[in-house]
């Protein structure tokens, strides 16, 4: 009997030890999960205050493509502008999030974008999300979605640890604000809904409410000043110059040298949109005069202008050596290799 009792005691002790081990493992797992959640919730600020998320010329065209590192982030036109990624060879396409996406800014661990799920089809799951519009931050792996502003927003620019963006208020209308990438310190910079173009710690914009002059404003706020008078729209910055369209001259393309404040007319025809190579050597633009409509390229040194493809296109985006663009009616998308000017269909596979 004593031997049997010892065996029972040993079995009971082993059972208690096993339970304690399981309890310790569960506690450690919970601690690990909690630590991982805290780490993911913690905002990773940029060390470089000069960090940017996209070019002003891409943002002029809706910010549907952006690049960070070796990855291109884009709004897939064949999946209701859902957020996707691919490598720089236009392969390994992956869906990141189901939002209708525009004004993409990408840098480091994060992607910032404007959500417009009100434009989604009625059968889309994204239409039933908590908020159909707003400014959002998401990790590049598709996790950790964070709402930074919940009402409609439009163009946005990432600079360092701040986002300069147009936000809509039902009482005040469209205004220019600055917010931290953590969603804190949301500060109004301008009462008018100017589209911000940022370079050298300065915000450039064309007036909206009282004039269409070209203005500048410090990124820290203060009083804006006029740097060039006229009737301009479609502003962007490339390589020390501002590009814009002159509304007094039938929307012809112009360039303002910021060092001399000399304005040069680059085209003599009406254009609808444009994009500029990063070195300013070439401008790709859409002629919109009703007779010669098409995609053209301008050599800014020689002044030579060449039609690359006839038709009506928009959303011109330059990423590395590629120009992405779409049919005006959204029926097809294309990509052109800037080296040989060969145009192909761009039809990324749709993921569920």
Please annotate each region the language model reported:
Residues 59-66, 99-108, 150-160, 190-200, ...:
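Repeated scaffold domains used in trafficking and secretory/extracellular systems
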Residues 68, 73-78, 107-131, 159-171, ...:
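Beta-strand C-termini and the immediately following turn/loop, strongest in propeller blades
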């Amino acid at each position: 009997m004593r031997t049997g009792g010892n065996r029972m005691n040993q079995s009971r002790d082993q059972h208690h030890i096993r339970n304690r081990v399981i309890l310790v493992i569960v506690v450690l797992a919970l601690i690990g999960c909690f630590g991982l959640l805290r780490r993911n919730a913690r905002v990773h600020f940029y060390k470089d205050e000069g960090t940017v998320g996209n070019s002003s010329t891409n943002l002029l065209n809706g910010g549907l493509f952006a690049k960070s590192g070796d990855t291109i982030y884009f709004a897939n036109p064949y999946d209701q502008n859902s957020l996707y990624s691919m490598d720089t060879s236009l392969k390994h396409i992956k869906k990141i999030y189901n939002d209708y996406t525009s004004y993409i800014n990408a840098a480091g661990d994060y992607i910032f974008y404007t959500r417009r799920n009100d434009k989604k089809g009625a059968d889309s799951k994204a239409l039933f999300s908590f908020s159909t519009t707003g400014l959002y931050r998401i990790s590049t792996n598709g996790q950790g979605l964070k709402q930074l502003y919940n009402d409609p927003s439009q163009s946005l620019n990432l600079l360092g640890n701040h986002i300069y963006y147009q936000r809509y208020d039902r009482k005040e209308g469209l205004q220019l604000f600055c917010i931290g990438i953590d969603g804190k310190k949301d500060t109004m910079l301008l009462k008018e809904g100017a589209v911000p173009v940022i370079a050298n710690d300065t915000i450039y914009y064309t007036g909206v409410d009282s004039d269409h002059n070209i203005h500048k404003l410090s990124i820290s706020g203060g009083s804006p000043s006029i740097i060039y008078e006229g009737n301009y729209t479609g502003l962007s910055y490339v390589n020390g110059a501002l590009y814009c369209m002159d509304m007094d001259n039938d929307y012809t393309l112009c360039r303002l040298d910021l060092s001399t404040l000399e304005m040069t007319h680059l085209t003599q025809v009406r254009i609808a949109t444009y994009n500029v190579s990063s070195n300013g050597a070439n401008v790709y633009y859409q002629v919109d005069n009703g007779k010669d409509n098409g995609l053209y390229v301008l050599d800014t040194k020689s002044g030579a202008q060449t039609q690359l493809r006839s038709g009506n296109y928009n959303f011109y985006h330059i990423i590395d050596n590629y120009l992405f663009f779409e049919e005006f009616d959204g029926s097809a998308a294309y990509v052109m290799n800037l080296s040989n000017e060969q145009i192909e269909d761009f039809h990324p596979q749709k993921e569920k």
